[in-house]
Amino acid sequence: MALPNINQNLTDTHSAEQKTPETKQVLPSLSQDETIEQIIGGFGWSQFLQALLVSVPTLIDAQQIFISIFADAHPKWHCNLNATCSPKSNICELPKSAWYWVDSSHKTIISEWGLECASSFIMGLPASSFFLGCLIGGFTLAIFGDFWLGRRKLLYLSCLTMCLASLLTAFSVNIWMYSALRLISGFGRAPIISCSLIFLTERVGKRWRGQIGSIGFFSYAVGLMSLSAIAYLNRGSSWRKLYLYTSISSISFCIMTYFFVYESPRWLFMQGRDKEAVDVLRGIASIPVKSLDLYTSVRLNLINNLIGFIP
């Protein structure tokens, strides 16, 4: 019986090993959004605080939209005891001596400036001016924000413009000045809701976007309720105080957004400001950047040429 040629078998095995192609580890193909998603992770305390900060402007926005319900309202009036009139009478057909305002004559702009018999154009001018400002601001400020200002500065400037205009509204001397300032206020508030929602969804991973987005709407509801509470406490007083109370406190919150809110990392990447984008991701990430897996770290370097920036 012939014995197998051991040397020949070893030679064949060695040749087969040489012909076997090398196995290479291939990094998974990740888009820039997927890379950012992996870095941001889930939901942490830093992201929660950022969500609260960017939700405050929606609270202020709700107050400034609906403040006219109280400031521009028709106050109640009564007939004088010695006058021949009834509550169902047309106030415009009665002499001034036949009736009086129930509360202070400075409670609303109607009673202070004697607009009870003004035309429908004059009566609707403040509200129309406000929403005209919203229309103009929606077109112009969005362009400035995407190309030059950035989303953080846009949110800050929009909120500050709205609040400063609201503060100046308290010192209006007539309906024309009042309407002009309402137009500026509407111009400033136009991009606030969209900016806040974008910031909210960018701060967390996809799993939490539905829950975190509701914070903005909750803040908006709080703004409505707080405005009603302020108006109730201010009942009988001048409408000017209502603008002062809502604007002075709001200006401080607007300033906080400039110093404590991070810029959008996606916008920074689009502008080529890669190092700043990585610093932002490091600040808002729910997991330490050092503990990122190999694929995510390498992919971020390949996409944005950031080798040397990530520790």
Label for each model-derived stretch:
Residues 2-10, 72-97, 211, 234-303:
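Central mid-sequence intracellular linker of multi-pass
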Residues 105-106, 165, 177-190, 248-251:
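Hydrophobic core of transmembrane alpha-helices in multi-pass small-molecule transporters
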Residues 170-180, 235-238:
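Helix-loop junctions at membrane interfaces in 12-TM secondary transporters
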